[in-house]
A protein has these predicted regions:
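A structural signal for isolated positions on well-ordered beta-strands in alpha/beta enzyme cores
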Residues: 36, 66-68, 128, 159
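Histidine/acidic residue-rich metal-binding segments in metalloenzymes
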Residues: 47-61, 77-159, 163-185
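Conserved short loop/turn motifs at secondary-structure junctions
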Residues: 38-43, 71-73, 103, 133-134
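Active-site mouth loops of central-metabolism enzymes
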Residues: 2-18, 68-80, 100-107
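Residue-level signal for well-ordered alpha-helical segments
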Residues: 4, 9-12, 26-29, 65-66, ...
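Alpha-helical scaffold segments that flank or form the walls of functional sites
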Residues: 1-38, 46-58, 83-90
C-alpha cells in the first residue's frame, strides 16, 4: 500500500495499459480465462480506472477481466474515495470494493462495509472486500460484511478475502462467525 502510494503521482495511463495488457496476454498464454483486478479509486485522476476499462474492452474477445472499484486508501480515510468510487462505477467498473481494516477506527470500518454494500445493493452490483488483513483477532470486519450481505440481500454476490485475522480468533467466536458467513452465501 505504501509503495503504491509513492508510485501514484507518477503513473500514466499508457504505462498502466501497457503493463496490464502484457499481464493479460501472459495470463491467457498460461490458460487463464478470467481475472478480477482491484482498481484504486483514491487517485482523483482515476487514471488506473480509465486505463483498465480500456484494457477490459481490448481483451474482451479472449479474457473476462472483472474490475473492482477499490478505495485503496480507505473509504472514509481518503478524502475523495466515495466520490471517486461512484464515478468509477458510473464509468463502467462493475464491482464495489472495500478495505475496512484500513480505516482509522473499527467503527469507520464497519460503517464503510455498510455504505459500500448499500451502494452495491442500490446498483445491483457485486461486492469484493479485503477484510481483516492483519494478525489482530479483534479485526472482525468479515462479520460486518456477512451481516450486511444478509441485510442488503446480496447473497451470492459478495466475496471477502485476505481474512488473515481469522487464524488468531478464538474458537468460540469463530464457531458463531462461520455459520453466519455460510448463511450469507
Amino acid at each position: 500500500i505504501q509503495l503504491w502510494g509513492e508510485l501514484k503521482p507518477d503513473l500514466t495511463q499508457e504505462a498502466i495499459k501497457d503493463r496490464a495488457l502484457r499481464y493479460c496476454d501472459l495470463a491467457v498464454s498460461q490458460g487463464l480465462l478470467a481475472i478480477r483486478s482491484h482498481v484504486d479509486v483514491c487517485d482523483s485522476r482515476l487514471l488506473a480506472v480509465e486505463a483498465l476499462l480500456d484494457v477490459q474492452k481490448q481483451v474482451k474477445p479472449y479474457l473476462d477481466l472483472q474490475l473492482v472499484a477499490f478505495p485503496q486508501d480507505g473509504f472514509y480515510r481518503s478524502e475523495n474515495a466515495e466520490t471517486n468510487l461512484l464515478k468509477a462505477l458510473d464509468l463502467g467498473v462493475e464491482i464495489v470494493g472495500g478495505i475496512p481494516h484500513f480505516e482509522r477506527t473499527m467503527e469507520d470500518g464497519r460503517r464503510s462495509v455498510d455504505a459500500l454494500c448499500r451502494i452495491a445493493a442500490e446498483r445491483g452490483l457485486m461486492v469484493d472486500m479485503h477484510c481483516d488483513e492483519s494478525d489482530d483477532p479483534m479485526s472482525r470486519h468479515v462479520e460486518s460484511l456477512a451481516s450486511a450481505t444478509l441485510r442488503f440481500g446480496l447473497q451470492g454476490r459478495v466475496a471477502g478475502s485476505h481474512l488473515t485475522s481469522m487464524h488468531s480468533m478464538d474458537n468460540y467466536y469463530v464457531s458463531k462467525l462461520i455459520p453466519l458467513m455460510a448463511e450469507s452465501g
